[in-house]
Amino acid sequence: MATSADPYRITNKLEPSRLEVVAARLETRGRHALFARSLSDYLDRMDIDSKANVLDLGCGTGVATRAIARRSGFKGSLMGIDLSSHLVEAARRYAVEEKLGDRVQFETGDSHTLAIASGSFDAVVAHTLFSHLDDPAKVLAEMRRVLRPGGVIAIFDGDYASMTFELADEVRSRQMDDAIIASIVTNPRVLRQLPRQLKKAGFAVDTVLPSIITEVGTADFWKSGVESFSKLAPVAGVLTEAQSAAWLEELLAASARGEFFGSCVYYAYIGRPA
């Protein structure tokens, strides 16, 4: 079992003001063209439009769930599960706003112990969930259990061990990278561990889609990222408010001067029962 300061790991225990920071980050990131393209690419590769019943684990505000529902070729049913009732309510609200409320269902639940009958879904998606899990192996076992024969899964997340934001001082850059990573994820190397974990859970890896989001000069995608990270790091107890504010100020100033550098590698794993 992992022990972590990661606020995303305990969204069922966060106060509403912190959950609003999480929700805003999920929506801003999810709507950015770079992130939306990665989602669309792996949904295409898993042939999501042909699936009758799809489960979105750790759905958050429903970014991936709604993206599937909006696809012109998708005619199936969708269920999103998240640990936080606050985020589930946000997901329902966004779905109604996009006139998708009759096509999607959102429920509160723990991905480690799903209250779902075995063999219920043709596809299971875990979009930006695995880096926040206490026990990835247990969640993989649940994904395998609720998947129908011939079904498909997709796991998409950041390889957060690769995430970096450059400051003027190299040593401080490394220190702050480590602190920020510790404050926003539970397992920064989980995507590197998936090949053996998927095999152990009874899955064969069908496809791996790597992508990298790097911004040089000016922060766009990463602007909302560093702003939210600076708010969450003190909550995690990894940095003080002053340290977080100074880090953010330096990065935004670098962006204003055209000197920003921020990067992270992402992977989508598509698997099927072995």
Place the predicted regions along the sequence by residue:
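C-terminal helical/coil "lid" or tail adjacent to the Rossmann-like core of SAM-dependent
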Residues: 2-25, 29, 206-262
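Conserved alpha-helix/loop element of class I SAM-dependent methyltransferases that forms part
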Residues: 32-50, 67
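A short SAM/SAH-binding and catalytic strip from SAM-dependent methyltransferases
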Residues: 122-135
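A short glycine-rich, Lys/Arg-flanked "PGG" loop and its adjoining helix->strand segment in the class I
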Residues: 137-152
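Conserved catalytic/acceptor-binding region of the Class I
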Residues: 152-219
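Core SAM-dependent methyltransferase catalytic element
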Residues: 201-203, 266-274
